[in-house]
Regions:
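Conserved S/T- and glycine-rich ATP-binding loop of Class I adenylate-forming
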Residues: 60, 77, 180, 186-189
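Structured binding elements
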Residues: 81
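Conserved AMP-binding/adenylate-forming core of the ANL superfamily
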Residues: 2, 6, 24-67, 71-75, ...
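AMP-dependent adenylate-forming
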Residues: 12-34, 139-146
């Protein structure tokens, strides 16, 4: 039997993986998460992000340490054609102001606080400086305070099962291989950080090259 062509978008790669592999995908502290759960949860989140008005080409910033919510958001963005802007959780006012202005982030996912930095205060104030920033999503059980620019959203509420869990995403969300998927910033050691854009095609090519180099297998 001829082998199937390699997936050319991250969403397609995830769908293929779900069909072929049923083991643990990620371990988050003491929680083992299978590929099927990653797919279902990211699809649910993708629908909720669409309901917020996010779609193809929109920038979604992620300011988180290593935790599973990062990956759920990454895959959800990939499914609706949005672009993830990865922001280091150690960045503070100066760096974040520059990157928010540069990348035109429309929604951002962050902890309420981290290492003594109050993200609720910073981000709610940032909405006045950056008109593109419409949605604040916080990884916490409590939503951010209601402010004139709009309330923050407790991220866990976007992951909760609901009546739209079987709804198909509209065709206009479907990403193409050369659509932008991810923006990361250089360290800026000799000047201001520079944005590096990564497409679906280049992200998958990089992953395959790394797997081949390290002799990584499905097990």
């Amino acid at each position: 039997m001829a082998s199937l062509p390699a997936p050319d978008t991250v969403a397609a790669a995830l769908a293929r993986t779900v069909q072929q592999h049923h083991k643990t995908a990620y371990i988050d502290h003491d929680q083992e998460i299978r590929w099927q759960e990653v797919d279902a949860t990211s699809s649910r989140l993708a629908r909720r992000l669409r309901a917020l008005g996010l779609g193809k080409g929109d920038r979604i910033g992620i300011i988180l340490p290593n935790r599973i919510e990062w990956l759920y958001t990454y895959f959800a963005a990939a499914k609706i054609g949005a672009v993830v802007v990865g922001l280091n959780v150690r960045y503070r006012d100066v760096e974040l102001d520059f990157m928010f202005a540069d990348s035109q982030i429309k929604a951002v996912l962050a902890p309420r606080s981290y290492a003594g930095f109050d993200y609720v205060q910073f981000l709610t104030q940032a909405q006045a400086r950056f008109p593109a920033l419409q949605h604040l999503l916080f990884v916490d059980d409590a939503p951010a305070p209601n402010l004139p620019d709009g309330p923050g959203i407790a991220f866990h509420t976007l992951l909760a099962p609901g009546g739209d869990d079987t709804a198909a995403l509209p065709p206009e969300c479907s990403p193409q291989p050369d659509d932008l998927l991810l923006v990361i910033y250089t360290s800026g050691t000799t000047g201001r950080p520079k944005a590096a854009g990564i497409t679906h095609r280049s992200q998958l090519a990089s992953a395959r090259a790394q797997a081949a180099h390290t002799k990584l297998t499905a097990d």
